[in-house]
Amino acid sequence: MNDPRIIVALDFPDSTSALDLVARLDPSLCRLKVGKELFTAAGPQLVEKMMGKGFEIFLDLKFHDIPTTVANACRTAAALGVWMMNVHALGGRRMLAAAREAVPPGSVRLIAVTLLTSMDQSDLDEVGLKGEPQDVVQRLAALTRDCGLDGVVCSPLETSRLRNAIGADFCLVTPGIRPADSSPDEQRRISTPRQAIENGADYLVIGRPITQATEPAVMLSRLNKDIEDIRDVSRFDNF
């Protein structure tokens, strides 16, 4: 598989647990996501170790700070050699533009988080964001595109609308992916792999259904098979 579409979320508290799981996966069949918990515990050394095993890494630290600080953080992350990194679109235009300037196009894929998949309408109302979740996501995605970033992280429930509004040359990364027979956990705006791809997602972030499976490699193969079954009838291969 030349361009694995599944990104396995390594939501572990330490490097030992993460590496135990990674040893059971094939780098040709998935990429790996390292988030705040694992990166805080294990640092860049773990990222380098996993890249040494052939895995491409999505560094999911959601940088959100003043423009100079975010630019410096992005530059440092890019120097690690990661495949993808993200910032938070709510940081605004100047922050997004500074991140793009620090990480030139064609080097690391630079994307932005729109809304966390744990947020629903009541959360938006409480923090004062106007509009329904899909409206807020579309505004933030348009801002991200205008600043020259490569794509956004968004709920699979927003992918179809974003794909139609923004077009094919914009990467949509979707967390909140669960097989039809699994628990939704704390995420509220979720979807199955098939639904997400049919709606226009490019990459699927999947954590517990794989990492907590009795046979993670078997579950990964099953999910990849689900994806392959619909690729020929989807715009999926055109990205």
Curated annotation (Swiss-Prot):
Classification via SMART domains: OMPdecase
Superkingdom as given in the UniProt entry: Bacteria
Database matches in InterPro entries: Aldolase_TIM, OMPdecase, OMPdecase_AS, OMPdecase_bac, OMPdeCOase_dom, RibuloseP-bd_barrel
PROSITE patterns: OMPDECASE
Enzyme class: lyase
CDD domains (UniProt xref): OMP_decarboxylase_like
Protein name, per record: Orotidine 5'-phosphate decarboxylase
Species assigned in the record: Nitrosospira multiformis (strain ATCC 25196 / NCIMB 11849 / C 71)
Gene: pyrF
